[in-house]
Structures are given as C-alpha cells and as structure tokens.
C-alpha cells in the first residue's frame, strides 16, 4: 500500500473516532424541523429555531423571552405530558402530511398521535409569531432564570 493511501485511511479512521462522541439528533427533531418549515412556508429556516430564546432547542428553564419562545415552552410541557403516558417523545417518529390546507397528523399508535399533536401545535404556534433575531443564540445562563 502506498504511503498516501495509508495517510488517507488514517485520517478517515481518526475522523470517525472523533465523530463517535457526537450524539445523533433524535429523528423526531428532524421531523419537527420539516413540520416547522411547512407551517411557516419556508419564511424562516427551521434551524433558526434550534437555539432561540430559553426554550427552543434546549431543555428550557426560566421565563420565555417572547411569544415564539412560549410556543417552544408549551411543546416541552406537551412532551413532558407524553412521557407521563409512557411515551418517549424524542425517539417517537410519526406520520404527518404537509398539504395546501396545512399540516395534518395521520399517525396510528397512541404515542405517535400524542407526539405529533405536540409538534403540530408548536409548528402552528411558531408560524403565527414574529421571529426576533436578537433572541437567537442568547446567553441562556444569564437570561433564562
């Protein structure tokens, strides 16, 4: 084997070892992102909601910074309620549709229905509120008490 091939192989192995420490995103978070984009009709990238305020994209604590952040707080509370019913919201994937008439859940199991309803309500809520760029990536330790 040529030395150049060995270097490439070594680089790939090292990068894979480093990537093993990065936890994968829950699948339903990806679904929720698509649901947000459907609800807001691509007005704002869904990733902009991942680190917004005190509750969007984090476990959440403190007082929400605005109504948009309250949407995420409500979703977190909905997820907590789903957990009380034996569901695992961050691991639960569900069936839904994005059509001309809007969003629609068409899941089968109790947990899928519950989690989809949480995400559906949150996506619709986010679509109704104004996005304030000043609340993106805030210092949550100082601001969210």
UniProtKB/Swiss-Prot annotation:
SMART domains: PA2c. Belongs to the phospholipase A2 family. Group I subfamily. N49 sub-subfamily. GO terms for cellular component: extracellular region. GO terms for biological process: arachidonate secretion; lipid catabolic process; phospholipid metabolic process. This is Neutral phospholipase A2 paradoxin-like beta chain. It is found in: Secreted. The lineage of its organism: Eukaryota, Metazoa, Chordata, Craniata, Vertebrata. Expressed by the venom gland. Pfam families: Phospholip_A2_1. Heterotrimer of alpha, beta, and gamma chains; non-covalently linked. Heterotrimer: Snake venom phospholipase A2 (PLA2) heterotrimer that acts as a potent presynaptic neurotoxin by blocking synaptic transmission and synaptic vesicle recycling. May act by binding in a calcium-dependent fashion to neurotonal pentraxin-1 (NPTX1) and neurotonal pentraxin-2 (NPTX2), but not to neuronal pentraxin receptor (NPTXR). Also binds to taipoxin-associated calcium binding protein 49 (RCN2), a protein localized in the lumen of endoplasmic reticulum. Coiled coil: none annotated. The keyword Disulfide bond applies. GO terms for molecular function: calcium ion binding; calcium-dependent phospholipase A2 activity; phospholipid binding. Keywords: Disulfide bond, Secreted, Signal. Disulfide bonds join 38-98, 54-144, 56-72, 71-125, 78-118, 87-111, 105-116. It comes from the Eukaryota. Residues 1-27 form the signal peptide.
